[in-house]
UniProtKB/Swiss-Prot annotation:
InterPro entries to which the protein is assigned, alphabetical: FAD/NAD-bd_sf, FAD/NAD-binding_dom, NADH-Q_oxidoreductase
Cofactor(s) essential for the protein: FAD
Entry keyword set: FAD, Flavoprotein, Oxidoreductase
Protein's organism: Mycobacterium tuberculosis (strain ATCC 25618 / H37Rv)
Pfam families, per database record: Pyr_redox_2
Family note: Belongs to the NADH dehydrogenase family.
The keyword Nucleotide-binding is annotated on this UniProt entry: no
Molecular function terms, GO-annotated: oxidoreductase activity
EC id: 1.6.-.-
Transmembrane intervals: none
GO cellular component: extracellular region; plasma membrane
Name the record gives this protein: NADH dehydrogenase-like protein Rv1812c
Domain of life, source organism: Bacteria
Entry keyword Oxidoreductase: yes
């Protein structure tokens, strides 16, 4: 039997698998002719971009609910090796699987430098499990002795994830530490750049800065973290901040599986792909999502985001089947780019274009953000094969 293996079950991986199933259906390929298999380290599709939120109950979807109706198999295991010449992947269980075509969609991870104490005492919202660990830690602190340090959270990294996390935390902390005792919850956002939101551009920066003020979030810019301890952080300036919680949100890098391939990678560890999501220099392999640097237009590469990961997955899934059956491949181009950043109780900010010009803010932008987070980025959850395959069509959604 011919086999397509998809590594990863995030935004790109899920949609690559469903996209492949859809194209097989469209070509009327007989059942049992091509096996589409997802291999990932968990039996869930996680809505990773919501990990900063207080309520995580809707952030994890059983893969069986969305892959099963589409006839896609799933293996729960960590892929440890890719043999591109032999067309075989090996997992942490010792099992190996041959493939005729591979879609690499193993995502990215937060970069944690070898700082004293970070591995032992730091938290993150990079994964669902990490977000749950942070949530349980904060709940534990709220049930213990109430001190200023217990009610203080330091967030490191003032990019998009760091800003959303910092803006969400004041409300969570006030709810957790509501018994008072004269202790005021405190959130401090740290970044080595001279200002917060360095990637958001000049138009959005004043909106972000005002939102941080409105949320009561303190900032320390132009400094870095030198060390982390159970009681707080020491900054490069020499300042020490007493805090029982340090959340690391600084920097992302593509999955380490990309390092096993004999081709160049960009500064984020991503593979270069062509317009059809084929990995340049590696036969029979496609890549989508955070592991791939794909051209969105003549000037801009894809961004590590679900905004780009989902359509990259859909196109990769369609093209991997087209490639198997000598059908024309579809080029991916996305003619627009937006950013919708959650600012907690201060609303949100919505920007358009690669220069990130603000077009909406406050409550209207918040409504858009909530619509994205709770509806737009979800697969159909009604168990309908027809709905799942229809949603996996190789197309680019209009702006939210």
């Amino acid at each position: 039997m011919t086999r397509v293996v998809v590594i990863g079950s995030g935004f790109a991986g899920l949609w690559a698998a469903l996209g492949a199933a859809r194209r097989l259906d469209e070509l009327a390929v007989l059942a049992g002719t091509v096996d589409v298999m997802v291999v990932s380290n968990k039996p869930f599709h996680d809505i990773r971009v919501r990990n900063y939120e207080a309520d995580l109950s809707a952030c994890r979807i059983p893969l069986g609910d969305v892959l099963g109706p589409a006839g896609v198999a799933h293996v729960t295991a960590e892929v440890t090796a890719i043999d591109a010449d032999g067309r075989r992947v090996t997992t942490s269980t010792g099992a190996s699987y041959s493939y005729d075509r591979l879609v690499l969609a193993s995502g990215s991870h937060v970069v944690k430098p070898a700082l004293p104490g970070l591995a032992e005492f730091g938290f993150d919202v990079d994964t669902y499990d990490g977000a749950v660990r942070l949530q349980q830690h904060l709940q534990g602190l709220a049930g213990g002795p109430l001190t200023s340090a217990a009610a203080t959270v330091v967030v490191v990294g003032a990019g998009l994830t760091g800003i959303e996390t910092a803006c969400e935390l004041p409300g969570r902390l006030h709810a957790l530490f509501a018994r008072g005792d004269g202790v005021t919850p405190r959130v401090v956002l740290i970044d080595h750049n001279p200002f917060v939101g360095s990637d958001m551009g000049l138009s959005a920066r004043p909106v972000i800065e005002q939102a941080l003020l409105d949320n009561g979030v303190e900032t320390r810019t132009g400094v870095s973290v030198a060390a982390v301890s159970p009681g707080g952080v020491t900054l490069s300036s020499g300042e020490r901040l007493a805090a029982a919680t340090v959340v690391w949100c600084a920097g992302m890098r593509a999955s380490r599986l990309t390092e096993q391939l004999p081709v160049a990678r960009d500064r984020l560890g991503r593979l270069q792909v062509d317009d059809y999501l084929r990995v340049i220099g590696v036969p029979a392999m496609f890549a989508a999502g955070d592991v791939a640097a794909a051209r969105m237009d003549d000037e801009h590469l894809s961004v590590m985001s679900c905004q780009h990961g989902r359509p990259m997955g859909r196109y990769a899934g369609c093209n991997v089947i087209n490639d198997l059956f000598d059908q024309p491949l579809l080029a991916l181009r996305i003619p627009w780019y937006v950013t919708v950043l959650d600012l907690g109780s201060a609303g949100a900010v919505y920007t358009e274009g690669w220069e990130r010009k603000v077009v909406s803010q406050g409550a209207p932008a918040k409504t858009t953000k909530q619509s994205i987070n709770t509806r737009r980025i979800y697969p159909p959850l009604n168990g309908s094969r027809a709905d799942l395959l229809a949603a996996a069509a190789p197309r680019v959604q209009p702006r939210p």
